[in-house]
């Protein structure tokens, strides 16, 4: 979900298609409708639908929460009333009590120590105005970096799901200090910020805070840095993991594995791993959503007289009955033999029957076929009866 420092660029009410005066029930109804229409399960492989779904979820995360919505509305009201001066907000703003703040002093646009606001309006404004400047404005890391990789699967592996080994090279927890960054494995709590990572200061009715300069915003102090990782808690190395690919993935789909990305510094959580799946074509099957399609060659006699034939599936073959008089190209449906779905069910197997004509006939077969043709004529059968081109 978006951080508060992105609220200035968002119109969450418009994203949900409601007015800013919409009730809680109206917002929830709009969210459910849009989430259902754009859910990734309904649009596998559709990146645009996935992006719309994320946008709607982000909007509802803010305006669907009473506390966040109040802060968001207050911020929009402040912007709309001209509470900030000029592009980039270089001037200042005035509270309702008429108290002037100089943004250069408050948000560190000038020289000296800057303070990122925290709490209520402080949280909102802190992210927005602490965008430029030097190292004091650097975002405090909260976890390790995400990692992206790609794999290629056979058609049937993707349809049924599989487990694959992967080797990844990147930041991993240090073996010596187990990710703490400390030789003893026990960093101490920063006495300057009492472990919060921030130091606070009050200016009138507002409270402001900034990353602690003593600990760099981590809340921890390392007096005995680990010699193998120089106190970072991470080492760059190659590691092997096993990745479970769920059944039914489609070509181009991304699978997210939480916590399998690069390790965070000084014991912070790891990032996520995103695996983009590529799927090879199959010689027998094609896919339509959760259904499998297969074309089976049959003889004219099997269609005319009816028969039972063996048809392949993702598992064992099944027996499929062809009713007598089945036309060429008819699709027969075998329920539950398609691509597995979440929850244990599966799509269907769509069997298209296609006549194969022999390229040559022996004397006995040719004689029998001629006898059949004569019998057709005697019975008055005309294959082109009712044909518009006749």
UniProtKB/Swiss-Prot annotation:
The keyword NADP does not apply. HAMAP family: DnaJ. The lineage of its organism: Bacteria, Bacillati, Actinomycetota, Actinomycetes, Mycobacteriales. Its cofactor is Zn(2+). One of its GO terms (biological process) is response to heat. This is Chaperone protein DnaJ 2. Gene3D superfamilies: DnaJ domain, Heat shock protein DnaJ, cysteine-rich domain, Urease metallochaperone UreE, N-terminal domain. One of its GO terms (cellular component) is cytoplasm. CDD domains: DnaJ, DnaJ_C, DnaJ_zf. GO terms for molecular function: ATP binding; heat shock protein binding; unfolded protein binding; zinc ion binding. It holds the Pfam family DnaJ. Zn(2+) 1 binds at residues 174, 177, 226, 229. It comes from Corynebacterium diphtheriae (strain ATCC 700971 / NCTC 13129 / Biotype gravis). Homodimer. Residues 11-76 form the J domain. PANTHER family: CHAPERONE PROTEIN DNAJ 1, DNAJ HOMOLOG 1, MITOCHONDRIAL-RELATED. Signal peptide: none annotated.
């Amino acid at each position: 979900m978006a951080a508060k420092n992105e609220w200035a660029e968002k119109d969450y009410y418009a994203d949900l298609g409601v007015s800013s005066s919409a009730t809680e029930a109206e917002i929830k109804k709009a969210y459910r409708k849009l989430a259902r229409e754009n859910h990734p399960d309904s649009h596998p492989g559709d990146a645009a639908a996935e992006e719309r779904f994320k946008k709607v979820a982000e909007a509802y995360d803010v305006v669907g929460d009473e506390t966040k919505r109040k802060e968001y509305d207050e911020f929009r009201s402040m912007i709309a009333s001209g509470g900030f001066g000029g592009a980039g907000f270089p001037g200042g703003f005035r509270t309702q009590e008429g108290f002037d703040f100089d943004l250069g002093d408050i948000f560190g646009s000038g020289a000296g120590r800057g303070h990122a606001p925290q709490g209520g309006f402080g949280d909102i404004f802190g992210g927005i105005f602490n965008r430029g400047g030097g190292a004091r404005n650097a975002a405090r890391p909260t976890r390790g970096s995400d990692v992206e990789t790609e794999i290629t699967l056979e058609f049937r592996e993707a349809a049924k799901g599989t487990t694959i080994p992967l080797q990844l090279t990147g930041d991993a927890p240090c073996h010596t200090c187990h990710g703490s960054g400390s030789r003893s494995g026990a960093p101490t709590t920063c006495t300057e910020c009492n472990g919060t990572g921030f130091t606070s200061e009050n200016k009138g009715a507002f409270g402001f805070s900034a990353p602690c300069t003593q600990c760099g915003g981590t809340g921890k102090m390392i007096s005995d840095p680990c010699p193998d990782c120089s106190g970072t808690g991470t080492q760059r190395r190659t590691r092997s993991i096993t990745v479970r690919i769920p059944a039914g993935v489609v070509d181009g789909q991304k699978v997210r594995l939480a916590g399998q990305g690069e390790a965070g510094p000084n014991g912070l959580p790891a990032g996520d791993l995103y695996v983009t799946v590529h799927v090879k074509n199959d010689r027998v099957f094609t896919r339509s959503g959760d259904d499998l399609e297969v074309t089976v060659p049959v003889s004219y006699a099997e269609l005319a007289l009816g028969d039972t034939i063996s048809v392949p599936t993702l598992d064992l073959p099944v027996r499929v009955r062809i009713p007598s008089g089945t036309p060429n190209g008819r699709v027969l449906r075998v329920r539950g033999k398609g691509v597995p779905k979440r929850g244990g069910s599966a799509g269907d197997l769509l069997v298209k029957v296609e006549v194969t004509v022999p390229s040559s006939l022996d004397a006995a077969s040719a004689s029998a076929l001629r006898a059949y043709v004569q019998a057709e004529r005697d019975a008055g059968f005309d294959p082109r009866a009712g044909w518009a081109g006749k």
